[in-house]
Regions:
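Non-catalytic DNA-recognition/assembly elements of restriction-modification systems
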Residues: 1-64, 163-204
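A short glycine-rich beta-alpha junction/loop motif
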Residues: 15, 98-105, 137-165, 170-171
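A residue-level signal for beta-strand positions that form part of recognition/binding surfaces
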Residues: 28, 55-56, 79, 104, ...
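Long, hydrophobic alpha-helical segments that serve as membrane-spanning/inserting helices
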Residues: 30, 34, 133-134, 142-143
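Generic recognition of flexible, low-complexity loop/linker segments
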Residues: 44-47, 68-70, 144
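A short beta-sheet element
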Residues: 60-64, 70-131
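Short alpha-helix boundary/capping segments
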Residues: 109-120, 145-148, 165-168, 182
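Short loop/beta submotifs within extracellular cysteine-rich repeat domains
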Residues: 129-133, 185-186
Length: 204
């Protein structure tokens, strides 16, 4: 039935499919050795944007667009960022000249290191971040409004593929990331086909 297909789409959208990476040698390193975690500036609001209007985007908790635009920027380049409030733990890769407000944090590679692939890191870290945010419980045992501040990331150990000499391998990270992307694309393709069936009102 149509309802069954809709339910299947909803379920499939929530599934995190992880490719088999058993063939790789993995080391676990502290997140704090790989990245500096920095929270955005709370002064960046829509009102602030109206007073300092310009071409450079400011990103907030939402991954669906910008909060405002300023005449200055705090970062220039490609970075991983995460939402600290609301749908906390969701990672968004940003590229260009931009700023973030207090509802988003940024992961800056430690000492300018160049051996980290952001696609691999996003696929690896996002489930860990989301679980950390989801794990917070209120006094009554109910989930609180999720938050994920930099201080909450201190104890994370990151699984990273290493080469035969035990060094972090950028090429293996890229190889694994491509597997993630391939699986994700297949998942997206299935969902689109199911959506098409519904829109055509085909009886199943």
């Amino acid at each position: 039935t149509k309802e069954t297909v809709v339910e299947q789409i909803a379920n499939l959208s929530q599934v995190s499919i992880v490719p088999n990476c058993d063939e790789y040698a993995i080391e676990y390193l502290p997140l704090s050795e790989l990245f500096d975690t920095i929270k955005g500036k709370s002064k960046y609001t829509k009102k602030y944007g109206n007073l300092h209007s310009g071409p450079y985007p400011v990103y907030s908790a939402s991954s669906q667009g910008t909060l405002t635009h300023l005449d200055t920027y705090d970062y220039d380049g490609r970075y991983m960022t995460w939402s600290t409030n609301g749908f906390a733990g969701t990672i968004l890769i940003l590229d260009g000249k931009f700023s973030i407000n207090g509802d988003r944090g940024i992961l800056v590679p430690k000492n300018g290191r160049q051996d980290l692939d952001f696609d691999y890191m996003k696929f690896t870290l996002e489930p860990i971040f989301r679980e950390l945010a989801k794990g917070r419980k209120g006094d009554n045992g109910e989930d609180e409004f999720t938050k994920l501040y930099p201080s909450m990331l201190n104890d994370i150990m990151v699984p990273i593929p290493v080469d035969g000499e035990g060094n972090i391998s950028l090429s293996l990270q890229k190889e694994i990331a491509q597997k993630f992307i391939s699986v994700q694309n297949s998942q997206k393709e299935i969902i689109e086909k199911l959506d098409a069936l519904i829109s055509k009102k085909i009886s199943i």
